[in-house]
């Protein structure tokens, strides 16, 4: 298309190849595995420490999240202010975070300061004290945030759905409460920290402009971390027998609608097909649910379908927030789209569109060494191998309508889905 052409749009080319990053794997002195992606032009380093120490290993509910947040709020030699000021002095960012399965510590730093910051992280790993005043503040803030969240229909619906899918005692299913936050004691945090934050369940992921000097300082610090842990995997809980939950709300204008069911982790043979199928259903702006409920009917601003996968399982869900006057029709249309995928093969044009969309997503995910490191971390921490991304990309390229329909029949039958409504009576 030249500058004067106002009639014909640019040609759309198919993405046939995604260049995967080269991952350098090595082991520290203490046996901790490191996955490194070196590259880029900026003098920035990202280091992620991932411990298998999340909810499945809790002796008491909510302890892994509290441990994650509070472990950097004081050590035997530094209080929280000193730690924060030390990190700020070097212009770095240090965050602790958690998902349901892991505890994560993430550092972004200029290359020249990594050697000064890693000893601070080592102090957190070895000498965290969990000061009572920090625990008290954490409990107050968490309860305040919980009260705010529980005023939102969409939050209540999410909590009810995951509890119904996994069970109220399952690590993926139980919900936070004020009583659980109030019940957290310093001894609980110390126990979880000492029994679950060790070198044997640690994996390190690095990205950026890495060379031998960075590898050396990582080994001289993180490679000397040793703590024997006594982990116990605890996954109790039974899913709810209720298939339909309807809860009233003070929000008189909107109803949160959720559908869902228990699935599997990303190593399951049907994961790729479900990933592709759910994208067609509600995973992008031009998806079937979005085109129907938003663009055509005007029932909602946003409707979405997704698959969440964890180490020990996963689930499929549909999410929509609609005006109360559109609840019945929205549910009818959602079920209609599910049945259509079960009964009718996907047309080639739509298959090609979604393949191109997903391939473009893969390209964006792998843009730069820091993003690449995050992708590799996501794969490894969910029990997959480094080469599983290549397998997924190839599976997307080769996906066919027969495989998609088989997956729809197995997993998208509306009669097998749990339905949650929070809002209108």
Predicted regions and their residues:
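His/Glu-rich zincin catalytic helix
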Residues: 1-85, 190-292, 331, 416-425
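Charge-rich, well-structured scaffold segments of protease-associated domains
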Residues: 1-7, 82-230, 265, 295-425
């Amino acid at each position: 298309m030249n500058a004067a052409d106002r009639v014909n749009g640019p040609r759309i080319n198919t993405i046939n190849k995604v260049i995967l990053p080269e991952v350098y794997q090595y082991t520290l002195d203490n046996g901790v595995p490191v996955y490194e992606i070196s590259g880029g032009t900026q003098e920035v380093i990202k280091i992620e420490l991932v411990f298998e120490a999340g909810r499945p290993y809790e002796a008491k509910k909510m302890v892994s999240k509290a441990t994650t947040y509070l472990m950097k709020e004081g050590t035997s030699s530094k209080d929280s202010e000193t730690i924060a000021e030390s990190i700020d002095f070097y212009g770095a960012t240090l965050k602790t975070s958690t998902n349901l399965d892991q505890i994560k510590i993430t550092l972004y730093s200029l290359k020249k300061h990594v050697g000064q910051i890693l000893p601070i992280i080592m102090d957190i790993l070895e000498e965290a004290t969990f000061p009572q005043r920090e625990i008290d503040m954490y409990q107050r803030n968490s309860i305040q945030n919980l009260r705010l969240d529980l005023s939102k229909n969409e939050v209540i619906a999410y909590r009810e759905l995951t509890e119904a899918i996994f069970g109220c005692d399952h690590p993926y299913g139980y919900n936070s409460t004020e009583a659980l936050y109030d019940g957290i004691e310093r001894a609980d945090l110390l126990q979880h920290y000492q029994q679950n934050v060790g070198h044997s369940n640690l994996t390190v992921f690095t990205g950026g402009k890495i060379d031998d000097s960075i590898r050396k300082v990582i080994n001289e610090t993180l490679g000397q971390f040793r703590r024997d842990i006594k982990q116990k995997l605890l996954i109790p809980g039974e899913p709810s027998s209720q298939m339909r939950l309807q809860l009233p709300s003070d929000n008189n204008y909107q109803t949160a609608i959720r559908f869902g069911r228990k699935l599997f982790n990303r190593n399951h043979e049907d994961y790729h097909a479900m990933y592709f199928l759910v994208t067609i259903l509600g995973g992008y702006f031009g998806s079937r649910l979005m085109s129907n409920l938003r663009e055509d009917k005007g029932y909602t601003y946003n409707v979405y379908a997704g698959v969440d996968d964890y180490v020990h399982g996963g689930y499929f869900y549909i999410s929509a927030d609609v005006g109360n006057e559109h609840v019945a029709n929205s549910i009818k249309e959602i079920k209609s789209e599910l049945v259509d995928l079960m009964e009718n093969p996907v047309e080639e044009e739509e298959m090609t569109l979604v393949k191109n969309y997903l391939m473009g997503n893969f390209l964006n995910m792998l843009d730069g060494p820091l993003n690449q490191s995050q992708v590799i971390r996501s794969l490894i921490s969910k029990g997959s191998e480094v080469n599983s991304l290549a397998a997924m990309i190839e599976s997307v390229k080769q996906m066919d309508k027969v495989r998609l329909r088989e997956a729809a029949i197995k997993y998208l039958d509306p009669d097998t889905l749990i339905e949650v409504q929070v809002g209108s009576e």
